[in-house]
Amino acid sequence: MQTKYNTDDLRICEIKEVIAPILVHEELPITDAAAETTLAARKEIHNILTGADDRVLVVIGPCSIHDPVAAKEYAQRLKAVKDELKDDLLIVMRVYFEKPRTTVGWKGLINDPDLDSSFNINKGLRIARQLLVDVTSMGMPAATEYLDLISPQYISDLIAWGAIGARTTESQGHRELASGVSCPIGFKNSTDGTIKIAIDAIGAAMSPHHFLSLTKMGHSAIFSTTGNEDVHIILRGGNDRPNYDAVSVEQVAEGLRKANLRPNIMIDFSHANSLKQCQRQLIVGEDVSAQIAHGDHRIMGVMVESNLKAGSQKQVEGQELVYGQSITDGCLGWEDTVPLLHELAEAVRKRRVANPDGSLKI
């Protein structure tokens, strides 16, 4: 029955149709090489999480992607280091297209690919998928953060590892998403530094769920998931207090054990652990490498923000951006990235000597 009252969409000023995921897949199909890269990396990460593989997972790359050309150059460089250190590290490139904002700001390449507030999301989805096809086809597995709950249908077949950020770890929708995606997932501790929410999220994501979402055809549907066994915690610090140190690792491992979860811990070298100073990631890396070298198998992975050029830059209208430099959080430059990766690889080799049976991972 019609009514003279309008109660809906009162704050919506425009609605544009978005291209269906299946059409983007058909337009930019996954290649055999990309599929092989992604499937192999997922299995290797699973083996690291179960203790069958004693390497350390390294998720490394730009804070966010804004220039696909620079991203591909970074991927080519990283692939060479990945191959060189493959016996000790599993290196996966951080390819982040969505940025959670504390208040407002540029939300990432998918949301605003032209960096001009035109919000051409259809273009952003295509650029993101094309970049992932290119990167994974060259043998470089990709990692991303799942922020929007619809965009995974456009890109998830090309993702080897995913993150749920500190601001969304408590979200029921993201826990449900994590229970159904085909890749391993890391949950970050809260922005205030507490870990219980992340531990709860791990338990939730390991369980089956039933929820509403969109199919690749773009239709609303009820999704039923099996649960995801390949989930773990990421320590990123909080309230300007780091939690990468050995005492914090022990406390988190104990919290995981009390929840009957395997003590798999990834450490984010950036964010509150670096006090938001990108070069301090090297200090964090030195400390974490020492913990690994002394035999701690609970540290199964690390996350690093790195780019071709160090630091970050602000967008200035009419001014060309510096090639290969972040426009969001500051990153390590390439000249610091390679030595850090070698330091981590050396730590893994020392761990094999110090604790060959992995007895510190209970």
Q: Which residues are covered by each model-predicted region?
A:
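Active-site-facing alpha/beta catalytic cores
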Residues: Q2-D9, D88-Y244, S248-V249, H271-A272, ...
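Conserved phosphate/anionic-ligand binding catalytic regions in large, soluble enzymes, centered on
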Residues: L57-A70, D329
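Acidic (Asp/Glu)-rich catalytic clusters
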Residues: L49-A52, K82-K86, Q130-G139, T225, ...
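Conserved, mostly hydrophobic/aromatic
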Residues: G61, I267, G333
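N- or domain-start disorder-to-order transition segments that initiate the globular core
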Residues: D9-L49
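Glycine-rich loop at the start of a catalytic domain that most often binds anionic cofactors/ligands
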Residues: P68-A80, T103-I110
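Internal helix-turn-beta structural module
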Residues: N307-A354
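A contiguous, surface-oriented mixed alpha/beta subdomain in the mid-to-C-terminal portion of proteins
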Residues: R236-G238, N243, Q251-M266
